[in-house]
Amino acid sequence: MYKTPSRILLTCVLVLAGTVLAIAATPSNEPPVAQGVILDFGGYDIYYQAIDDPGNDPVESLVELCDYYSMTAVWDGASLVSVTKEQETYPEAGNASVWKLYLNDKGSIGWKACTDDPKSIRIGDYAAVCWGLCEGRDLPTPGVDATGVCFYGYGQSYRIVSLAPSCTETICATGAGNIIVGADEFSNYPAYIASKLSTGEIVSVGGYTNPSYETVAKLNPDIVIGVGDQSVHRSVMEKLRAHGVNCLAMFPGDSIKTILDNTYMVGAAMNYQLKSTQTIEQIEDALNAIDAALSAGQSRTSKVMISLSTSKSPWVAGGTTYASDVINRALCENIYSQETGWVMVNSETVPSRDPDYIIVVSSDYGNTDRDYEDMVSSLSAEWRSTTAFSNGNIYLLTEGATDLASRPSTRIAQFTELMCRMVQHGILDDAELPMHIGDDYRDYLTITKELGFET
């Protein structure tokens, strides 16, 4: 027996009375199991069908999904050959993608292709189950969050708590900013979030690294969204889940693709999937426009360093960061691409790797010529011996530009355009760029100027 499905299933919303602590729920350490089947056409075109019986197999579940959405599935035994929806058949003629069954084991993160007979699979034995249209070794959009919990079927959200600025920006970009009831104290974008935090209309739930579980619980949220690589976020969400509160842990922002996946996940978990896919399309279109501009111009492969300070031994963007991905998108090379994550590096490596451009991301300075001059004059001998210093190619991103560059959020296209303007001189020259950029960063954007998702 199947529950009534929808694009993202609308289930009965649990009305929370009093505090969340009073909800009758039994805490469990058992890994959550799949409650339905996912159909992923690629490009974030995804459908979900909830089931009541975890013993159902993926074949019968997909048949039910296709019946509900007036789709037609063509099978060769238990192998899915094609799916037709809205008079279009997938895969299209000449497309190398094929339908496969993908499974996400309980207690783990990541799809694996099923090599067994799909009819022998019990959906309830896995955290998530997906029929995905993929090419080669490509995988479907993640079906679980950063804690291995499937985020489909949560139902409509009406009260949201965000535990991080990047989460807040993503929630707002997917159209749900008006129902945020709690946020971390550093969430300041869009501007209306900062205003509501200052008046108490949105309750501060603490800092990024020390959110208050009690404060979050008292807000009776439908869903709490945090960052999966923050142990304190995971701890808070684990307690909330034990009391019946839906939670989503976003993946660390290690690439542009991960940011887009997070955007989809947030929208799907809140039942704002349509808006989230529209947001993703806008970001992708802008990134493609930037790519086209770079391809049409005389791009150069320069060496770039992104630093979080002017310290002699600074913290820099390593290879597994969205910032490094942005450098690559600008057709340049991150001199610390062999490092992992954001990492403190030895001072001697700065001159030895000799960056052509240095981008300092720091709110320790103001956005004036004097502040910039003070920053440059304070640089160590190691920094002064670089090509970037000799050629006057050291940029300062401060004030609002610091947030833009330091948050893996839906403003990633704006950061990418700004990066290209800094490191690809002569290509995007329709706006004159100063050496220090702050709250005025939008003044230097043309392709992505309206992609701040401020409303």
Residue positions per predicted region:
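Short, low-complexity disordered leader/linker segments with a strong preference
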Residues: 1-29, 153-157, 455
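Second-shell loop/turn segments in exported
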Residues: 44-53, 113-116, 156-158, 203, ...
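Basic- and aromatic-lined ligand-binding clefts that recognize polyanionic substrates
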Residues: 159-174, 275-333, 422, 434-454
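Ubiquitin-like/PB1-type beta-grasp interaction modules and other compact soluble beta-rich domains
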Residues: 25-153
